[in-house]
Amino acid sequence: YKRQSILFTFLALATCLWTGCNDDEELPAMSRTSLKSYGPTFCEVQSRLYLTGGSDIKRSGACWVLKSTKEYDEKALEFATVEDNVQELPINNPDLYRMRIEGLQPDTVYYVRFFATNDEGTFYSYPVRVPTTKIYNDKVFVEMGKFMMGSAAGKVDEMPMHEVEFEHSFYISKNEITNAEYCEFLNENEVGADATVNGDQWINLEDPTCQLSHDGSKFVVKAGADQLPVVCVTWFGAQAFCEESGGNLPTESEWEFAANSGLLKMGTAYAGSATASEVGWFNESALHQGGMKKANGLGIFDMSGNVAEWCHDWYSDKAYEDAPEKDPQGPKSGSKKVVRGGAYNQAPVTITGRDAQQPTTASPYIGFRVVNKI
């Protein structure tokens, strides 16, 4: 694919140089179209205009066609024209141009390319394959971008505020993982009655607040607790569930970005509101079914309160001091894992608040959700 596109661009430039850059019959010349970002209903594409050609560019932008199958085949390209779907963008001078195309269909493959038309005709750049992603009932799409992580007025371990950039978009669970979901996971993986795998306990069934038990043949959920968030799960048990789902626990930065409504950047103290009680259960005597409070700007529930949530990162109170700007993964080692969001038995905890527990901890106040990177 790369060889084809490089050859395509080279031939275009070679043709231009062969005919002469001042030739009145010269078409514009552009680089191959590249894909910068995509999601369920949009994509962002980019191309560079090298030459305007022998006359002014009168029409320009991007055009696209869809491909009905998601099977990847380098040779099965589609070449859109201005007779197909078009979104116009003024392209006048040699420069890098980026365009966002909205209104695409989820879970569909498109082929997109830039075009530029002058008096001599239309030049088309080499197309790029755009596989839009699915829309899920139980997951929320979080588009990649930048945000300011941490707090300038919080606790010491929330400082300093620093810019984080994600080079990937991701999906995150709309709700905290439930007892029913975790019970099904244990049974499908034929986990033993002690819920221990390779020496790591996944869930503490002996804790009286645990809503799962083993009846001698399989794991079962206690009556009325199916839709409550699963608790008494260790970090190992939470991460195992995430991996089975094709994902991971959220990194600390992914968690805070999603809680802050991603690119909407709501900037509220809690996940979707400046008032804790609108979006989260705090100072309560028991946990609650997910989705009973207001969601944040992305439609994610209970990132403030109900149960606190495991994150993937090791904890350090100095993690922010030398954190990488792009896709931070946290410290390489440690003794405790990050916990975020606060729990129903606590006073309100802001979305920048940080806590930590040993990964073997099976707390009645800690649950989790899943992140699937794109």
Predicted regions and their residues:
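Hydrophobic core positions of the immunoglobulin-like beta-sandwich fold
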Residues: 101-102, 230, 290, 300
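Short, surface-exposed linear motifs at loops/turns and structural transition points
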Residues: 21-135
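Bacterial N-terminal signal peptides
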Residues: 8-16
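Active-site microenvironments of metalloenzymes and redox enzymes
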Residues: 151, 165-272, 316-320, 373-374
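Short, well-ordered junction/capping motifs at the entry into regular secondary structure
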Residues: 224, 276-304, 331, 355
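Conserved small/polar residues in nucleotide/adenosyl-binding loops
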Residues: 1-4
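Disulfide-stabilized, aromatic/cysteine-rich ligand-recognition loop
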Residues: 294-296, 331-374
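Cytochrome P450 core scaffold surrounding the K-helix E-X-X-R motif
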Residues: 149-158, 311-324
